[in-house]
C-alpha cells in the first residue's frame, strides 16, 4: 500500500528543514509566531460596569483632560447607582429631572475629586497597609460581598429620597464641612460647589478617626444610658411620624438583613475593643472633639457632657 488506510490529508504537518549538508542554502524558517506589542484583554461588560476604584497600570499622577475623563463603576449618564450612598442623589435635582451639560461636566470633576478624597482617608485609616481589628467588612466568608451589595442598595435608596430631604442633607453636610475646614478658603469653595466631595469628606473623616458609636463603647452603665437616650432622640427626630422614610432605614431591606446587621454591629464593638489602649483612647478623644465642634459650639453644658461621656459624643457623630 502506498499509505496507511487511516491516514488523511493534512493529518501530519510537513517537516520544515533549514540549512543542512543535504539541502541548499535556503532561508531558515522561523517557527516563532509574531506577536503584537500591545497586549489586549477582553473585559466583560458586567465586570466593567461594577469595577472598583482605580485601575492597574494607570498613572493617576498625570491628570487627563476633564472632557476625556470617563466614569468607572456606574453609568456615565447619571450618578444614581454608585458604590456608596455619599455619591448618590446629588446631581439629579433639576426641574426636568435631567442635569444640564455644565452639571454633567461638574459631576465628572466632583466625582473624580471625591474618589481622591476617599483614597486619602483610606490610607489614613490603614497607614501601614494592614487592616486592624476595626475593619467592618465582615468576619466570615461572604459578609464582605453582602456589605458591598448593601452599600449599593443604600445608594439606590438615597437617590429615591424626596428633593427637600436631599437638599437638607446637602446643606447640613456642607455646614459641617465648613466647620472642619478650619478657615481654609480653598476647601470651603470646593465643598460649596461639590456636594459629592463634601459628603465623601464627611464620611471619610468619621471613618478614619473612628468617631462612631459602633467603635466607641461606653465605659459604665451611666454612659451607656445617656448614649442610648441620644440615639433614641435622633432616630425619633429623623422619623417623626413613626414610619421610616425611603432611604432612612439602616437595618436592611430583605428578610434576615436586620439580624445580620445587629450581629455585625456587636462584632464591630468586640473587634474595636481588641485594639491597643492608645487607639481606644484616641477614638474617645476624637469623638468628643468632633461632637463639640459640630454640635455644641456655644453650649457649655453640652460640651461638659460630651467631654465626660465619649460614647455620647460618638452617638452625636453617628447621625
Swiss-Prot record:
Where, subcellularly, is it found? Plastid, Chloroplast thylakoid membrane
Q: Mention one GO biological process in which this protein takes part, according to its record.
A: photosynthesis
Q: How the protein sits in the membrane?
A: Peripheral membrane protein
**Which residues are listed for phycourobilin 3 binding in this entry?**
299
Residues annotated as binding phycourobilin 1: 96
**What are the protein's UniProt keywords?**
Antenna complex, Bile pigment, Chloroplast, Chromophore, Electron transport, Membrane, Photosynthesis, Phycobilisome, Plastid, Thylakoid, Transit peptide, Transport
Residues annotated as binding (2R,3E)-phycoerythrobilin: 212
Q: What does UniProt say on post-translational modification here? A: Contains four covalently linked bilin chromophores.
Q: Where is the transit peptide?
A: 1-71
Where mainly located?
A: plastid
Q: Which GO terms describe its cellular component?
A: chloroplast thylakoid membrane; phycobilisome
Where, by residue number, does phycourobilin 2 bind?
A: 135
Q: Where is the signal peptide?
A: none
Oligomeric state and partners?
A: Heteromer of 4 alpha, 4 beta and one gamma chains.
* The name this protein goes by in its record: R-phycoerythrin gamma chain, chloroplastic
The protein's organism comes out as: Corallina officinalis (Coral seaweed)
Amino acid at each position: 500500500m502506498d499509505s496507511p488506510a487511516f491516514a488523511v490529508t493534512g493529518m501530519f504537518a510537513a517537516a520544515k528543514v533549514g540549512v543542512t549538508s543535504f539541502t541548499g542554502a535556503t532561508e531558515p524558517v522561523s517557527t516563532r509566531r509574531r506577536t503584537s506589542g500591545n497586549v489586549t484583554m477582553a473585559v466583560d461588560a458586567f465586570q466593567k460596569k461594577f469595577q472598583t476604584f482605580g485601575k492597574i497600570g494607570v498613572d493617576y499622577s498625570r491628570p487627563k483632560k476633564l472632557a476625556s475623563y470617563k466614569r468607572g463603576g456606574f453609568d456615565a449618564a447619571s450618578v444614581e447607582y454608585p458604590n456608596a450612598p455619599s455619591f448618590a442623589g446629588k446631581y439629579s435635582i433639576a426641574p426636568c429631572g435631567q442635569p444640564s451639560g455644565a452639571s454633567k461636566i461638574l459631576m465628572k470633576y466632583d466625582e473624580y475629586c471625591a474618589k481622591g478624597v476617599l483614597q486619602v482617608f483610606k490610607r489614613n485609616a490603614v497607614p501601614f497597609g494592614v487592616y486592624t481589628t476595626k475593619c467592618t467588612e465582615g468576619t466570615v466568608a461572604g459578609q464582605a460581598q453582602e456589605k458591598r451589595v448593601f452599600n449599593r442598595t443604600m445608594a439606590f435608596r438615597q437617590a429615591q429620597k424626596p428633593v427637600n430631604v436631599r437638599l437638607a442633607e446637602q446643606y447640613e453636610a456642607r455646614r459641617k464641612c465648613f466647620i472642619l475646614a478650619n478657615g481654609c478658603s480653598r476647601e470651603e469653595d470646593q465643598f460649596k460647589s461639590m456636594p459629592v466631595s463634601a459628603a465623601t469628606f464627611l464620611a471619610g473623616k468619621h471613618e478614619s478617626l473612628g468617631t462612631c458609636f459602633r467603635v466607641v463603647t461606653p465605659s459604665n452603665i451611666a454612659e451607656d444610658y445617656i448614649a442610648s437616650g441620644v440615639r433614641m432622640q435622633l432616630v425619633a427626630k429623623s422619623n417623626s411620624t413613626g414610619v421610616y422614610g425611603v432611604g432612612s432605614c439602616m437595618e436592611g431591606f430583605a428578610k434576615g438583613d436586620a439580624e445580620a446587621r445587629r450581629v455585625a454591629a456587636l462584632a464591630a464593638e468586640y473587634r474595636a475593643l481588641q485594639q491597643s489602649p492608645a487607639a481606644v483612647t484616641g477614638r474617645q478623644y476624637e469623638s468628643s472633639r468632633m461632637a463639640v465642634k459640630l454640635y455644641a459650639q456655644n453650649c457649655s453644658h453640652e460640651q461638659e457632657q460630651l467631654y465626660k461621656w465619649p460614647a455620647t459624643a460618638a452617638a452625636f457623630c453617628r447621625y
